[in-house]
UniProtKB/Swiss-Prot annotation:
Name assigned to this protein: Ribonuclease H2 subunit B
Cellular-component GO terms for this entry: nucleoplasm; ribonuclease H2 complex
Species, as recorded: Mus musculus
Predominant subcellular localization, coarse grouping: nucleus
Entry-linked Pfam families: RNase_H2-Ydr279 (PF09468), Ydr279_N (PF17745)
Keywords from the named record: Acetylation, Nucleus, Phosphoprotein
BP term (GO), one: ribonucleotide metabolic process
Subunit structure: The RNase H2 complex is a heterotrimer composed of the catalytic subunit RNASEH2A and the non-catalytic subunits RNASEH2B and RNASEH2C.
Family from the record: Belongs to the RNase H2 subunit B family.
InterPro entries recorded: RNase_H2_suB, RNase_H2_suB_wHTH, Rnh202_N
Length: 308
């Protein structure tokens, strides 16, 4: 666990992070922190999100925040309100590069990478080009040409879908290895009724893994991946959860059964035929003369009349 400071807060707000051990060890060896927090475009939404880059090990981490109500941290001699817990988890930088490759791919031409990964809103995106083995990774999602010792790239939809399929399969293996039960989660996210949930367990894993990968790619690409994986679409009638509101109508409602056949006479007959318990038999033998009926205690009182 490590603590950090939010430079944007004049009160030096401290943040609590859970980091992999090797990140702290690398910083100690360098005697200087090599961790850099940057704001980059989220590959799913395109909006800004905070990421962590280890400049020493050349690794990218996404930041997940766990928030709980009425929670605070005791840090040394101070109390930090809010109680946010930040997690740094490794992330494939190719997902962030894919955001820019998709944009450039609309032009349908080969371009050098330094002209593709450009963003005035998030200028730190150029740090992604420093990651080792970048060229090998780009082969999974682009077509490549070399002219005068300079390489040019063009987005490839076919290659990208095959690469994402591998990511889905790797996720399925990880889910099974960790004994993650995905059946109920798939039913909830897809609004399937109990009788319509896929009986094929493998399909449930693939559908759930597809949902996880979709958090790192645009909606349009997620839909293309779903078709590529041949995942069946949920029925149109179940696209949205069923409404619980009653349907109102001006027409009179007719009973489907004749409830008048269950009259008082039948009920009394039924009581006579039913067997009495020992306590009921003993109560029946008690002399009830002079006793008031229970109705006398709850009925309307009669007004007394007399001469004045």
């Amino acid at each position: 666990m490590a603590g950090g400071r939010d430079r944007g807060d004049l009160a030096a707000r401290q943040l609590v992070f859970l980091l992999p051990e090797h990140l702290k060890d690398a910083s100690k060896k360098k005697k200087k922190s090599s961790l850099l927090f940057v704001k980059l475009a989220n590959p799913h939404s395109g909006e800004g999100a905070t990421y962590l880059i280890d400049m020493c090990l050349q690794q990218l981490f996404e930041i997940k925040v766990f928030k709980e109500k009425h929670h605070s941290w005791f840090i040394n001699q101070s109390v930090q309100s809010g109680g946010l817990l930040h997690f740094a988890t490794p992330m494939d930088p190719l997902f962030l590069l894919l955001h820019y490759l998709l944009k450039a791919g609309k032009e349908g031409k080969y371009q050098p990478l330094d002209q593709v990964v450009v963003d005035d809103t998030f200028p730190d995106c150029t740090l992604l080009l420093r990651f080792p083995e970048l060229e090998k990774s780009l082969r999974h999602v682009t077509e490549e040409k070399e002219v005068n010792s300079k390489k040019y790239y063009k987005y490839s939809s076919e290659k990208t879908l095959k690469w994402l399929e591998k990511k889905v399969n790797q996720t399925v293996v990880a889910l099974k290895a960790n004994n993650v039960n995905v059946g109920a989660r798939v039913q909830s996210s897809a609004y399937f009724s109990g009788g319509q949930v896929s009986r094929d367990k493998e399909e449930d894993y693939v559908r759930y893994a597809h949902g996880l990968i979709s958090d790192y790619i645009p909606k349009e690409l997620s839909d293309d991946l779903s078709k590529f994986l041949k995942l069946p679409e949920p029925p149109a009638s179940l696209t949205n959860p069923p409404s619980k509101k009653l349907k109102l109508s001006d027409e009179p409602v007719e009973a489907k059964e004749d409830y008048t056949k269950f009259n008082t006479k039948d009920l009394k007959t039924g009581k006579k035929n039913s067997k009495m318990t020992a306590a009921q038999k003993a109560l029946a033998k008690v002399d009830k003369s002079g006793m008031k009926s229970i109705d006398a205690f709850f009925g309307a009182k009669n007004k007394k009349t007399g001469k004045i």
